[in-house]
Amino acid sequence: MMTRKKLADLAELAVQESPFTKMSLDNLANEEIIRRQLQVEIEKHFRSKEAASGLVERIRKVTGATMNRARTAAQTERTRALNGKRVSDAIRKYLDEYDKAAEGHRKRPEMPVFQWVNPRTAKEPRHEHVAISGDKRPLGEEFLPGLRYPGDPQAPAHQTINCHCYLRRAR
């Protein structure tokens, strides 16, 4: 963890610590603490299998966010976690089958194929997500530029925040 002291030591290498630098370093340290606390609460939520409202309350407790912001963050994190797990599990299974096929000199397994599903539960669904609902892609291929699956952490935020979509295994 990058502590305030470590950040301050790093800053002193380049310049003397000014009041502005001190304030900036304090903010960075606080953001890191909140980010870590939030990650812990999200993990606790998924381990406990509590209702979605539980995650909203956990987010509010850590961040002090309004109810609407906490709901948006909770929906975003649920989408990211659930679809990320589906993709991760599919990758692991594919690689296991691939290794077994290589050991036994058998035919390589087919790449898993996923279907994008927009459940239309959002008040204002993204037009791009509605348009690709039902589309199928092999694992790892993009459904939209930069978007491999709903909640993809490497995708642009405007494609993932408050997304209600999910992947369904098609093959």
Locate the predicted segments by residue.
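Domain-core detector
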Residues: 1-160, 168-171
